[in-house]
């Protein structure tokens, strides 16, 4: 009679199963640090008093770690929007913003908000919020393919005669007309054309593109001395044309701006009649051969001042990552109620170290990937985050770090292989 010898299963595979399985089942994700971050040291920031170490109330006035001030181009009371449109005077604190970095963090904008209650004509302060959204949307988009940004002055035209500069009618006639673009009103209706030059470089900075404002006043013709004059003009070059014209019945006049990306070159600014604008400043930018989304942090006042959501509206995927505050602006340990917000200070801590990933969920120093792999095309969609599921919004509800994700699945595969080995071993014993 044949006897079947059954060998007992090896204790080693069973031991491995019981040792590895708990790791598979209990591995946990690493929570990213919510706020802006950077992958390399080649980064820069743009700000206001909350990142200006020249402020007399530093460090209590800061929302960033004090040691990061050299990384930021900042001025108390200013913003990139204010500096685009106005010169430095008693009404507006303009600043020559200039900075370079592959990665960019923007934390400014609050100094021009509905709290200022500015209106030039009848657009109201919220009409200027729309202009602000348009400006930052174009700025962020252009900056995502640029390393350097510099505000530059343009040479004024010299061939004008018999004209006066335009003025605002809002705020009882006390509102200061934007200096950029400059509006001029001629004494007579004549077709006038003047040239302006967008340079290809400025003080050692390469300018392969310029952010230029084109502003106009809508609402039909303008009544002057019993005559209603059409309102219109255009910018033109052999490869560029942008215009506005209206000759309808005079109505509600609003000051509206388009923000244009223009290449270096010589352009004509030409009037259709009595009014003309020409640019006096531009944001000069170079061009990178890849795209790195910029990062913008919500810039608001405390609850005692009226703010807007222009930064959030302007900062959109794929060219910008927006970090929204979850609480009102609160500064119990700051210089005043509008400087030293605790939440933003915590958000900005992520800028103190290089991270391996920057995403809408935040940044983390843990990753299995190099910076070269992240810049193109994964900056903003981090390789070390595994998307568990998508939602109808732009952000993922949950993410898991790849270190744990990869380890979990490797261990799971090993356990499955060991189970098959054990089964095969048992079957072969019969």
UniProtKB/Swiss-Prot annotation:
The residues exposed to the Intravirion compartment are 426-430
Q: Can you tell me which residues form the catalytic site?
A: 49, 336, 339
Keywords in alphabetical order: Disulfide bond, Glycoprotein, Hemagglutinin, Host cell membrane, Host membrane, Hydrolase, Membrane, Signal, Transmembrane, Transmembrane helix, Viral envelope protein, Virion
Pfam families named in the record: Hema_esterase (PF03996), Hema_HEFG (PF02710)
Residue ranges for the region (Esterase domain second part) are 275-390
**Domain of life of the native organism:** Viruses
The record's GO CC annotations read: host cell plasma membrane; membrane; viral envelope; virion membrane
EC assignment: 3.1.1.53
**Membrane protein topology class:** Single-pass type I membrane protein
Record's comment on post-translational modification: N-glycosylated.
Q: Which residues are glycosylated?
A: 88, 117, 159, 165, 247, 268, 289, 324, 354
| Subcellular location, record wording | Virion membrane; Host cell membrane
Which residue stretches are annotated as topological domain Virion surface?
A: 28-404
- Which cysteines pair up through disulfides? They are 53-69, 120-168, 207-284, 215-257, 315-320, 357-382
TM region(s), chain numbering:
405-425
Spell out the residue ranges making up region: Receptor binding: 134-274
Instruction: Give the signal sequence positions.
Output: 1-27
Recorded catalytic reaction(s): these are: N-acetyl-9-O-acetylneuraminate + H2O = N-acetylneuraminate + acetate + H(+); N-acetyl-4-O-acetylneuraminate + H2O = N-acetylneuraminate + acetate + H(+)
Indicate the family of this protein.
Belongs to the influenza type C/coronaviruses hemagglutinin-esterase family.
Task of the protein = Structural protein that makes short spikes at the surface of the virus. Contains receptor binding and receptor-destroying activities. Mediates de-O-acetylation of N-acetyl-9-O-acetylneuraminic acid, which is probably the receptor determinant recognized by the virus on the surface of erythrocytes and susceptible cells. This receptor-destroying activity is important for virus release as it probably helps preventing self-aggregation and ensures the efficient spread of the progeny virus from cell to cell.
The name of this protein is Hemagglutinin-esterase
Specify the species: Porcine torovirus (strain P10) (PoTV)
């Amino acid at each position: 009679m044949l006897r079947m010898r059954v060998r007992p299963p090896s204790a080693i595979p069973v031991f491995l199963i019981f040792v590895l399985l708990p790791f598979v089942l209990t591995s946990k994700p690493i929570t990213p640090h919510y706020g802006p971050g950077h992958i390399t040291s080649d980064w820069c920031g743009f700000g206001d008093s909350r990142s200006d170490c020249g402020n007399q109330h530093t460090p209590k006035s800061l929302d960033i770690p004090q040691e990061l001030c050299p990384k930021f181009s900042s001025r108390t009371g200013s913003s990139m929007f204010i500096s685009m449109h106005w010169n430095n005077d008693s009404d507006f604190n303009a600043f020559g913003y200039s900075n370079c970095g592959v990665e960019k963090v923007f934390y400014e904008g609050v100094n021009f908000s509905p709290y200022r209650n500015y209106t030039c004509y009848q657009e109201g302060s919220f009409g200027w919020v729309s202009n602000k959204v348009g400006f930052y949307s174009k700025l962020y988009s252009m900056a995502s393919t640029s390393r350097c940004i510099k505000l530059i002055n343009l040479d004024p035209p010299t061939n004008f005669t018999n004209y006066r500069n335009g003025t605002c009618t809002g705020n009882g006639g006390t509102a200061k007309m934007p200096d950029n673009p400059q509006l001029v009103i001629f004494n007579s209706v004549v077709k006038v054309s003047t040239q302006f030059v967008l340079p290809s470089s400025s003080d050692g900075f390469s300018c392969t593109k310029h952010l230029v404002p084109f502003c106009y006043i809508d609402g039909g013709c303008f009544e002057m001395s019993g005559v209603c004059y059409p309102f219109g003009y255009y910018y033109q070059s052999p490869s560029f044309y942008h215009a506005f014209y209206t000759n309808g019945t005079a109505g509600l006049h609003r000051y509206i701006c388009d923000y244009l990306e223009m290449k270096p070159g010589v352009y004509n600014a030409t009037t259709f009649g009595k009014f003309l604008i020409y640019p006096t400043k531009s944001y000069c930018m170079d061009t990178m051969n890849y795209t790195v989304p910029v990062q913008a942090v919500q810039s608001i006042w405390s609850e005692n001042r009226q703010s807007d959501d222009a930064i959030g509206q302007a900062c959109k995927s794929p060219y910008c990552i927006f970090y929204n505050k979850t609480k009102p602006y609160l500064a119990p340990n700051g210089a005043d109620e509008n400087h030293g917000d605790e939440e933003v200070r915590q958000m900005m801590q992520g800028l103190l170290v290089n991270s391996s990933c920057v995403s809408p969920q935040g940044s983390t120093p843990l990753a299995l990937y190099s910076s070269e792999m992240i810049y193109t095309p994964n900056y903003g969609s981090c390789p070390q985050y595994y998307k568990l599921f998508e939602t109808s919004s732009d952000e993922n509800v949950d993410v898991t770090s790849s270190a744990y994700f990869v380890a979990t699945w490797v261990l799971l595969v090993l356990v499955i292989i060991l189970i098959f080995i054990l089964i095969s071993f048992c079957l072969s014993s019969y």
